[in-house]
Curated annotation (Swiss-Prot):
Binding site for UDP-alpha-D-xylose: V322, D350, T379, I380, W381, D483, W484, S564, R587, K588
Pfam families: Branch (PF02485), Xylo_C (PF12529)
Ranges of biased composition (kind: Basic and acidic residues): 134-150, 166-193
Cystines in this chain: C246-C274, C290-C531, C550-C563, C552-C561, C664-C918, C911-C924
GO molecular function: metal ion binding; protein xylosyltransferase activity
Post-translational events: Contains 7 disulfide bonds.
Name of the protein this chain belongs to: Xylosyltransferase 1
Biased amino acid composition, Polar residues: 152-161
Cellular component, GO annotation: extracellular space; Golgi cis cisterna; Golgi membrane
Source organism per UniProt: Canis lupus familiaris (Dog)
Membrane topology: Single-pass type II membrane protein
Glycosites: N215, N410, N768
Enzyme type, top EC level: transferase
Similarity annotation: Belongs to the glycosyltransferase 14 family. XylT subfamily.
Length: 950
């Protein structure tokens, strides 16, 4: 009887204590809700997501501490994290309370999926994903490595790891500690994998035969396979035709072996490493044949009037064009500008560029002084194959006894002349005994270190593998700079046919060198009997912008960090008119980036085309051609090209309909025949799809071309906010972001469920501000949200949120908010696939690809609590429709795809490439937009009386 009142009092006290504890927790949450800021993606000063040359392929950084509440009542700005600026206004109190209730500090149990909501992950809160730190680079004259190379760690040799999940223990550690912890964790994972292959940072030696030692009875009982071993982490099985002849102990060689894909390449890596280790690969001493002390540097003068004093015996030039890609019309325009009947043109097309090779063969047949190499190499950036291409081209040219040339000039399709042929011939005739190469312009020891000349490289599997260190041979001076040069015939003969100690050993040394063409000819010339003929000028202007061009963009094909020139723009035109030093060519030019500058230069040299000439502001570039085969297309591209063709047929039926019946109705047949990008006035206008279709009126096959253009999807908030830096600018989403030219190389933004989209924002000038970016999927699931600091000088920012795949097909939205007030938004399409591995998709594949990520969780944390704040309700009907769509196949799937494509693309026009039964269908050659329409600026015709084409 006495115990009962005591128990009741205890319960009341416990209840009061519990309420007090909950109140304290609520207050702590109010104070502690901290949304982490995110550094600018690719701003002018703070720069992009991970250009940093020093970084490894790594998991996304761990979340930083949560940021402070943005949605406080109006008042003094709350201080934000180091990357954020300003506090601000927020949604109403009721919305704030809901948002707060949905984002507790600790993870909460997963809510069961109810009607109108999709199941989401339990961790409900906001975490930012910081991009990697940026390494700043500077101009270093003419060669392709960063100037501040002492600060660049090129040990980017670890096998790629899977994207890491949220790791709370890293959240409050500084970035350096996070990296250390992640590195230790990766090392522990590698050690824990059975028979795992050593990765980056390990010095474990492989015994001869390539088999790793194993512990315990497993090693004794396991069946042995000679010259075979498994690598960890899903790496390819390591096989050798012959066992390596030494212990492979260098970390670079071990890493190269773990990443090489083919058995042949791994064999070559092992053999090369062992030959070098045994002292059988590199020359130790080389003979110098130059009698001069130091470096010769002849001064040459440019005289604008020299063309008037043409010599009686003008030089004849062998132009060697080393080209790749698909920009055939730009190549033809450049060829047209440099052509003269007195010169010779030898064209090498990359082994992987079959479309361009077909186009080059076609126009080369028209001219007797144009030939195409009967052999082809894959000339990767920085690869030894480029030097091999030049040396073989030189040998071929010297063996062509009917081509009496005097100078060797190498060009690419991205070059363009900036002075006339007559001026070039007059200048070279005056200095016919000289060789023109651009040197690096700094001390050799520093150049050797920055250029990686003291490192051993091997090219195989279309990759340059770094295998270790080496010594520079004694007895010679090493030089280098630009790999664009003009060499006279005497020196070319010496390099090609000489068997002396210098040439023989330098060819061996540079066969295992990164960017060998940037140094081989310089070094041989400076140490040869021809050393007094060197002119430190390659007669070119190269558009170096180290801040943009040194993004380590070639790390996927070379174990080093390099730079690339930027494309010229109209504002650069004045640079071509300088006369301080002799220059005759400039690079780089890209018509898909800017064609106006090419037109300006062309008109400056050769005058304007006649008034009314068609196609001068248009540019077409092929991205698919039927002989390439559909295996050359991705499933996303093949899916959308088919949908674009059907969109064109529907336009023909609706807009070209005539009373006579079905004469303008078609049924699609087969795969697309070709696809072109179409630009007008340097603006992307969409795709041109050439495709086959059966005319239903006559049951005959016709070939048509459809023009589809993306609809405008970027819009400023209405009513406009007081935030003005996005006005007249843009927000875009895509893949293949080019940080150098600051555009998406995936023109049109064709995306599928397994793509990893990047968000890009272009800014106007203004004060430093912080904006919030929110990604919303087709059923209003908030997939990601993060802050970006836009500095006053920033023009672009970009970031790729680490979303779990697959993405849900449909129309996505990216919103930009300032102080949680909408500023702008854009939309992008994630297309459902109708093809998988270039075959019609199977029913068992559609649900895996079209139903979104597991439990609809795009990231570790959920942002479901922000839906009411942002007025983004999740509709049960919309969710159910998405579920049904995800299981669609056949005609139902095509109908779903076409409805999505029709909402984001417009069929602008359609034409017939040949005979047609549709009486109102226009012929493609009579349109201004078709890839079959006239293009005089790139068309090659008969040689004119003055010997030129232009």
């Amino acid at each position: 009887m006495v115990a009962a009142p005591s128990a009741r009092r205890l319960v009341r006290r416990s209840h009061s204590a519990l309420l007090a504890a909950l109140t304290v927790l609520l207050l702590q949450t109010l104070v502690g809700w901290n949304f982490s800021s995110l550094h600018s993606g690719a701003g002018e000063r703070r720069g992009g997501a991970a250009a940093g040359c020093t970084e490894q392929p790594a998991p996304p950084p761990a979340p930083a501490p949560r940021r402070e509440r943005r949605d406080l009542p109006p008042g003094p700005a709350a201080p934000l994290g180091a990357c954020c600026g300003g506090g601000g206004r927020g949604p109403p109190a009721r919305a704030r309370a809901r948002a707060l209730a949905g984002c507790p500090e600790e993870p909460r149990p997963q809510q069961p999926a109810g009607q109108g909501a999709l199941p989401t992950r339990a961790l409900d809160g906001y975490f930012s994903h910081r991009p990697k730190e940026k390494v700043r680079t500077d101009s270093n004259n003419e060669n392709s490595v960063p100037k501040d190379f002492e600060n660049v760690d090129n040990s980017n040799f670890a096998p790629r790891t899977q994207k890491q999940k949220h790791q709370p223990e890293l959240a409050k550690k500084p970035p350096s500690r996070q990296k250390e912890l992640l590195k230790r964790r990766l090392e522990q994972e590698e050690k824990g994998k059975g028979q795992s292959f050593p990765g980056k940072g390990t010095h474990e030696a492989l015994p001869p035969g390539g088999r790793a030692a194993v512990n315990g009875s497993h090693g004794k009982d396991a069946p042995r396979q000679p010259h075979t071993r498994k690598s960890g982490g899903g790496s390819p099985e390591l096989r050798y035709d012959q066992p390596p002849k030494c212990d492979i102990s260098g970390k670079e060689a071990i890493s190269a072996l773990s990443r090489a894909k083919s058995k042949h390449c791994r064999q070559e890596i092992g053999d090369t490493y062992c030959r070098h280790k045994l002292g059988m690969l590199m020359p130790k001493k080389v003979t110098r044949f130059c009698s001069l002390e130091g470096k010769a540097n002849k001064n040459v003068q440019w005289d604008e009037d020299s063309v008037e004093y043409m010599l009686a015996n003008p030089v004849r030039i062998a132009f060697v064009l080393v080209v790749h890609g698909r920009a055939s019309r730009q190549l033809q325009r450049m060829f047209k500008a440099i052509y003269h009947k007195d010169h010779f043109y030898y064209i090498h097309v990359d082994k992987r560029s079959n479309y361009l090779h077909r186009q080059v063969l076609q126009f080369a047949r028209q001219y007797g002084n144009v030939r195409v190499t009967p052999w082809r190499m894959a000339t990767i950036w920085g690869g030894a194959s480029l030097l091999s291409t030049y040396l073989q081209s030189m040998r071929d040219l010297l063996e062509m006894t009917d081509w009496p040339w005097d100078f060797f000039i190498n060009l690419s399709a991205a070059d363009y002349p900036i002075r006339t042929n007559d001026q070039l011939v007059a200048f070279l005739s005056r200095y016919r005994d000289m060789n023109f190469l651009k040197s690096h312009g700094r001390d050799n020891a520093r150049f050797i270190r920055k250029q990686g000349l003291d490192r051993l490289f091997l090219e195989c599997d279309a990759h340059m593998w770094r295998l270790g260190d080496r010594r520079i041979p004694e007895g010679i001076a090493v030089d280098g700079g630009s790999d664009w040069f003009l060499l006279n015939r005497k020196f070319v003969e010496y390099v090609t046919f000489s068997t002396d100690d210098l040439v023989t050993k330098m060819k061996q040394f540079y066969s295992y060198t990164l960017l060998p063409a940037e140094s081989f000819f310089h070094t041989v010339l400076e140490n040869s009997p021809h050393c007094d003929t060197m002119v430190d000028n390659n007669l070119r202007i190269t558009n170096w912008n180290r801040k943009l061009g040194c993004k380590c963009q070639y790390k996927h094909i070379v174990d080093w960090c390099g730079c690339s020139p930027n494309d010229f723009k109209p504002q650069d035109f004045h640079r071509f008119q300088q006369t301080a030093r002799p220059t005759f060519f400039a690079r780089k030019f890209e018509a898909v980036v800017n064609q106006e500058i090419i037109g300006q230069l062309d008109y400056y040299l050769y005058g304007n085309y006649p008034a009314g000439t068609p196609g001068l502001r248009s540019y077409w570039e092929n991205v698919y051609d039927e002989p390439d085969g559909i295996h050359s297309l991705s499933d996303v591209a093949l899916t959308l090209y088919h949908s674009f063709a059907r969109l064109g047929l529907r336009r023909a039926e609706s807009s070209l309909h005539v009373e006579t019946g079905n004469s303008c109705r078609y049924y699609p047949m087969g795969h697309p025949a070709s696809v072109h990008l179409y630009f007008l006035a340097d603006r992307f206008q969409g795709f041109l799809i050439k495709h086959h279709a059966t005319n239903l009126a006559v049951s005959k096959l016709e070939t048509l071309e459809t023009w589809v253009m993306p609809k405008k999807v970027f819009k400023i908030a209405s009513p406009p906010s007081d935030f003005g830096r996005l006005q007249f600018s843009e927000v875009r989403v895509g893949t293949d972001w080019d940080a150098k030219e600051r555009l998406f190389r995936n023109f049109g933004g064709l995306l599928g469920p397994m793509d990893e989209p990047v968000g890009m924002q272009k800014w106007g000038k203004g004060p430093n501000v912080t904006v919030t970016v929110i990604w919303v999927d087709p059923v209003n699931i908030i997939a990601a949200t993060y802050d970006i600091l836009i500095e006053s000088t920033a023009e672009f920012t970009h970031y790729k949120p680490p979303l779990n795949l697959p993405l849900r097909p449909g129309v996505w939205t990216v919103k930009i908010l300032h102080h949680w007030v909408p500023v702008a938004e854009t939309k992008f399409l994630v297309a459902p696939l109708t093809f998988s591995n270039r075959q019609p998709i199977k029913p068992e594949e559609v649900l895996k690809l079209h139903n979104g990520p597991l439990r609809s969780a795009y990231m570790e944390q959920s942002f479901q609590s922000l839906n009411p704040v942002l007025s983004l309700p999740i509709s049960p009907a919309q969710v159910e429709q998405a579920r049904r769509n995800a299981g669609s196949t056949g005609a139902t799937l095509e109908h779903w795809l076409d409805s999505l494509v029709g909402g984001t693309w417009t069929a602008m026009d359609i034409c017939a490439t040949g005979p047609t039964a549709c009486p109102v269908m226009q012929t493609c050659t009579h349109t201004a937009w078709s890839s079959f329409s006239p293009d005089p600026k790139s068309e090659l015709g008969a040689v004119k009386p003055d010997g030129r084409l232009r």
